[in-house]
Amino acid sequence: MAFDKLGRFFGISEDDEMNEVPYTESEEQQEEIPQTQKNERRANVVSINSGVSATSKIVLYEPRVYSDAKEVAQNLLNNKAVIINFARMDDEQARRIVDFITGTVYALNGEIQRVGDKIFLATPPKFETDGKIAELVEKKDKMD
């Protein structure tokens, strides 16, 4: 009798054991929710930018004064490669512009290469250049 009161206090009694419903596996199978529809919808998502092909531009410059370096740097900032011909400038001014452009290219993680006697190629970060023209120029200079 004392055990019955104690059992009821904790929720354990002989009456409760009689009221339990046996578990069947058929109930579990009915509760499953199909998830294949969600996965099929996600497979149809396509990035908008994946079909668009970007065009790359190369800008040619023949600077005559130091202030022209700003335009060259602006094109590099706009992800355009720049070929600079210093044939019509004195060497001191050309060195100043090359120093300025080299700083710009360094800040952008780009590259600058000498491709001729007074010709440089400056490229922004995502441009690839292949080959070396400098070797051909050196061979030509040795032949002359």
UniProtKB/Swiss-Prot annotation:
Main location: cytoplasm
Disordered: annotated span: 14-41
One GO CC term, this protein: cytoplasm
Domain of life: Bacteria
InterPro entries: Cell_div_SepF, Cell_div_SepF/SepF-rel, SepF-like_sf
Keyword tags: Cell cycle, Cell division, Cytoplasm, Septation
Regions of compositional bias (Acidic residues) in chain numbering: 14-31
Gene Ontology BP, a term: FtsZ-dependent cytokinesis
Location in the cell: Cytoplasm
PANTHER family according to UniProt: CELL DIVISION PROTEIN SEPF
Family: Belongs to the SepF family.
Oligomer status and interactors: Homodimer. Interacts with FtsZ.
Annotated function: Cell division protein that is part of the divisome complex and is recruited early to the Z-ring. Probably stimulates Z-ring formation, perhaps through the cross-linking of FtsZ protofilaments. Its function overlaps with FtsA.
Protein name: Cell division protein SepF
Organism listed in the record: Lactobacillus johnsonii (strain CNCM I-12250 / La1 / NCC 533)
